[in-house]
Amino acid sequence: MAELTINADDVRNALNEFAASYEPGNAERVEVGRVTTASDGIARVEGLPSVMANELLRFEDGTLGLAQNLDVREIGVIILGDFTGIEEGQEVHRTGEILSVPVGDQFLGRVVDPLGVPIDGLGEIQAETTRALELQAPGVTQRQSVKEPMQTGLKAIDAMIPIGRGQRQLIIGDRKTGKTAIAVDTILNQQANWASGDVKKQVRCIYVAIGQKASTIAEVRQTLEDNGALEYTTIVASPASDPAGFKYLAPYAGSAIGQHWMYSGKHVLIIFDDLSKQAEAYRAVSLLLRRPPGREAYPGDVFYLHSRLLERCAKLSDELGAGSMTGLPIIETKANDVGAFIPTNVVSITDGQIFLQSDLFNANQRPAVDVGISVSRVGGSAQVKSMKTVSGTLKLDLAQYRDMQAFAMFASDLDAASRQQLTRGSRLMELLKQPQYTPYPVEDQVVSIWAGTHGYLDEVPVEDILRFEREFLEHLRHSTEILTTLAQTNKLEDSTVEALKTSIVDFKKGFFGDGANHLVGAGHEEFDSLSEADVDQEKIVKQKR
């Protein structure tokens, strides 16, 4: 067997050739960090000097984290998932990706978490693309004024606090005053637009549930499905059981999904239910990250938290497709205190607010809109002409009615004009009541408010106002073309007004039984009048409140 010989020159030449051909640029640099502490959904990581703000990091067990605090020696990371498997000393790797969420039409009718992962058990979602959660809002030159109506189907709102497409309208009130009900009714009211198939009319809806009970979210989903509204709605759910980081991110995830449609020239309605819980989650995260607290222990940038979110709602210019995203943020108050820190912040950011008063709600005035301090700063220009015509003095009439009502509590007798004001005001308040999940088409609202403001309901007992309205609208629907004309033209022409006058006079004759002395109540039974002998000096006294 030949002896193996090694020549030193051959070895030297081979090493020189390898060294000459080596290119450092082909070497991959891998940064590895290590967990120093992990608890309460927050981890602190050493290393990773090149990490970006809002970059996704991957822990050893596959859990993702979001880089937040970029300090000199360590990084504060929000853990996006279960943190029980993350321990001190474990490796952390960069992904090189900014936090983003998948988007597209396939999300309609689905329930997803703040990372865009479906949680409704209906399988995977084939996304069209992804969109970063933190995006710059449209600039001034990329917007145009709000000029298209966003009908809620609620008489009290569409008449006095109108909302336009691209507007941000705050819904604020104590717990259990009907805030979510208004938002859900607004979604249900878009059904006719969706069924039309016209992209310019259709509104895609996003319901972002932040810190709600899982049973409440399931109830909202079931309501939308039962009423045929789930097919054009996406639900982004971060229930109360989710970590604070998920609740903080949920509104941005919903906004990113909506922006994809907005920049495609489509119309979007997004509801944040509610931003109070998002602010509390952000406060918890910030305190755990050891950021300095400010007023009410909120961090100093809590205003920016909401402003950068709500500024994404806009009506885009024609050059960008004229799409829109309308925002309905919800804020929960404590004891009707709208002057608290978070409520005043969001009021100053939005284009108006709908204040729901718990006293009105408990008095069965639902929706419990307090017309006195509710306002829409830009929606009036988007109101349809017929509604603007009939509701012009409605807000003033109700304000005068409330003043007169307070005065009448202490006055022994009133003049005829004051009594007339109280009579009409009480009927207008009754007319603005509306059952839940029954939004009205705008033409029905116009007819109802026209009848109330022009005195055609003054003779109708207050307890029969809603029955009169319901039966009169049914009469118009079957016997005339008035509602069809209003829906097509959105104008209250003189000929339409004359036809309405004739119809309501004829209907009142039948409603009151051609002037017979019938009792008009909740039931439909008829009773004979009692003789004076049977009613000997009987008096009915109406107690004053």
From Swiss-Prot:
Gene3D superfamilies: 2.40.30.20, ATP synthase alpha/beta chain, C-terminal domain (1.20.150.20), P-loop containing nucleotide triphosphate hydrolases (3.40.50.300). HAMAP family: ATP_synth_alpha_bact. Transmembrane segments: none annotated. The record marks S374 as: Required for activity. Produces ATP from ADP in the presence of a proton gradient across the membrane. The alpha chain is a regulatory subunit. GO terms for molecular function: ADP binding; ATP binding; proton-transporting ATP synthase activity, rotational mechanism. Its main location: membrane. It comes from the Bacteria. It is found in: Cell membrane. GO terms for cellular component: plasma membrane; proton-transporting ATP synthase complex. It catalyses: ATP + H2O + 4 H(+)(in) = ADP + phosphate + 5 H(+)(out). Keywords: ATP synthesis, ATP-binding, Cell membrane, CF(1), Hydrogen ion transport, Ion transport, Membrane, Nucleotide-binding, Translocase, Transport. It comes from Renibacterium salmoninarum (strain ATCC 33209 / DSM 20767 / JCM 11484 / NBRC 15589 / NCIMB 2235). PANTHER family: ATP SYNTHASE SUBUNIT ALPHA, MITOCHONDRIAL. F-type ATPases have 2 components, CF(1) - the catalytic core - and CF(0) - the membrane proton channel. CF(1) has five subunits: alpha(3), beta(3), gamma(1), delta(1), epsilon(1). CF(0) has three main subunits: a(1), b(2) and c(9-12). The alpha and beta chains form an alternating ring which encloses part of the gamma chain. CF(1) is attached to CF(0) by a central stalk formed by the gamma and epsilon chains, while a peripheral stalk is formed by the delta and b chains. It is a peripheral membrane protein. InterPro entries: ATP_synth_asu-like_sf, ATP_synth_asu_C, ATP_synth_asu_C_sf, ATP_synth_F1_a_nt-bd_dom, ATP_synth_F1_asu, ATPase_a/bsu_AS, ATPase_F1/V1/A1_a/bsu_N, ATPase_F1/V1/A1_a/bsu_N_sf. PROSITE patterns: ATPASE_ALPHA_BETA. This is ATP synthase subunit alpha. ATP binds at G173, D174, R175, K176, T177, G178, K179, T180.
